[in-house]
């Protein structure tokens, strides 16, 4: 009896060449359903439809096609087992040797921000995962393919082995199949948890540990290397968030590139992003990042002006940096981007003039990330620790100046209040202990990652230099002593903002009053580790 391959795919890339090779080179009979059968027949291949094979028509609008003993018996039967072979003979079931199935595009469907509950539910595959799991369970006798990326590898293994692919290949394919269905189920659960339609009573809610919070993610690409060249790395991503980005030019991405891009994007989104989506840009903004810390941030009348001001904040540190822009890159911005060596740029889009200019920098990585991809991404912040992960809410709540209090005798001026808000928006994106000096919508100096707060302040103030005179200073945590306030005043800082809450707050407030500084307390800390 000729071997049989069952093909039923949503992603039809490569399915015709695969079926041609199976049938014409290796003598497989082809069994298929629905749209896949139509594609194969149009390619001139002899196909038996599943409905003809089982004697049962597709019903319920296609919800039931392959859930039939003649399908699953053929997949699950152990070859050489007398009892199984007797059952096959009695029920007139033919063995199925290769199962090629990929699933309804659920993740792609729910990546659309306005997707309805019913539309998403209709894209939950039932028959597909059942066939995949059946074939993976019986991998001792059946090969299962769940992605077009596997086809060439499978055909190569098939050509190099008489009597079908060897057990090691089938075992590896089974592993990949179970990973595929696991990721699919977690994606469904994850999406349902996020929906307003699902509001269970407290008594009916499952324990938190029973709900999968982390979506199993498919491999997006193997990276050049990890944080260092001797470390291997890979990027796993859903179609949402960074998975929705398109790289327009440049070298392959590294781990550090993605970490810096993430930091830059989070910072520039403080000012909105793009012209569509949930939070469109209200003002053009630019961010330059090095080692996940912003070294230059600015707003301006146009993305080119914002970029120039951001780079001017610290052009020495900007060399080799990562840039995020919240508006379409135009010609002037592109010219500024070519003025120094940069690793990556991310923006919601690029004009044709900008792309022509930037093409001269062939190694510069240009990424286009639409606002809709950002809006659809999960809101959890996840980090790994040895043997586990930590999950927390993103620190992206809107800034609320109405919750602030002025602790000093002197009230900040209108201009100082605007600068304090700008600095407070940014300091939460700087590694603790974090200090940021700013004025007129431009960062002037950043102190990051020091083990004591006054050390970070010293770095930020020295970076700002003479521009610190009349500027403001923000701190992500409270001042444990009055030394930071006194240092700030000695450099000409006129107002400071911090969470407050130190046992020695009174000392810092007293120093502000002595030195004529305004002090604002926000009541909210913004540590970043």
Swiss-Prot record:
Domain MGS-like: 1-146
GO CC, alphabetical: cytosol
Catalytic activity from the UniProt record: (6R)-10-formyltetrahydrofolate + 5-amino-1-(5-phospho-beta-D-ribosyl)imidazole-4-carboxamide = 5-formamido-1-(5-phospho-D-ribosyl)imidazole-4-carboxamide + (6S)-5,6,7,8-tetrahydrofolate; IMP + H2O = 5-formamido-1-(5-phospho-D-ribosyl)imidazole-4-carboxamide
Cited Pfam families: AICARFT_IMPCHas (PF01808), MGS (PF02142)
EC number assigned by the record: 2.1.2.3, 3.5.4.10
Swiss-Prot/TrEMBL GO biological process terms: 'de novo' IMP biosynthetic process
Entry keyword annotation includes Hydrolase: yes
Molecular function GO terms recorded: IMP cyclohydrolase activity; phosphoribosylaminoimidazolecarboxamide formyltransferase activity
Pathway: Purine metabolism; IMP biosynthesis via de novo pathway; 5-formamido-1-(5-phospho-D-ribosyl)imidazole-4-carboxamide from 5-amino-1-(5-phospho-D-ribosyl)imidazole-4-carboxamide (10-formyl THF route): step 1/1; Purine metabolism; IMP biosynthesis via de novo pathway; IMP from 5-formamido-1-(5-phospho-D-ribosyl)imidazole-4-carboxamide: step 1/1
Keyword hit for Ubl conjugation: no
InterPro entries recorded: AICAR_Tfase_dup_dom_sf, Cytidine_deaminase-like, MGS-like_dom, MGS-like_dom_sf, PurH-like
Keywords, sorted A to Z: Hydrolase, Multifunctional enzyme, Purine biosynthesis, Transferase
Gene3D superfamilies named among the record's database cross-references: 3.40.140.20, Methylglyoxal synthase-like domain (3.40.50.1380)
Similarity section: Belongs to the PurH family.
Domain notes: The IMP cyclohydrolase activity resides in the N-terminal region.
Protein name: Bifunctional purine biosynthesis protein PurH
Organism, scientific name: Synechococcus sp. (strain CC9311)
Gene that this sequence comes from: purH
